[in-house]
Swiss-Prot record:
Keywords on record: Ribonucleoprotein, Ribosomal protein
Protein name in the entry: Small ribosomal subunit protein bS21B
Gene: rpsU2
Region of interest (Disordered), ranges: 37-57
Pfam families: Ribosomal_S21
Highest taxon of source: Bacteria
Any one of the GO BP annotations: translation
Molecular function per GO: structural constituent of ribosome
UniProt KW Acetylation keyword: no
Basic residues bias locations: 43-57
């Protein structure tokens, strides 16, 4: 669980910014987006192969 403690004299905006940064770094948002819909294993393999092909260019 990602947690951010509000420091003394720290604004909520800056704490929220730190929280968003931690969430992004942990990969939680991308994981949520990936799990929004079911993806068949064959479609997952196809997508990963396509991404690897694009990286090799």
């Amino acid at each position: 669980m990602t947690e951010v403690r509000l420091g003394e004299n720290e604004s909520i905006e800056s704490a929220l910014k730190r929280f968003k940064k931690k969430i992004q770094k942990a990969g939680i948002l991308s994981e949520i987006k990936r799990r929004e819909r079911y993806e068949k294993p064959s479609a997952r393999r196809k997508r990963k192969a396509e991404a690897a092909r694009k990286r090799r260019r």
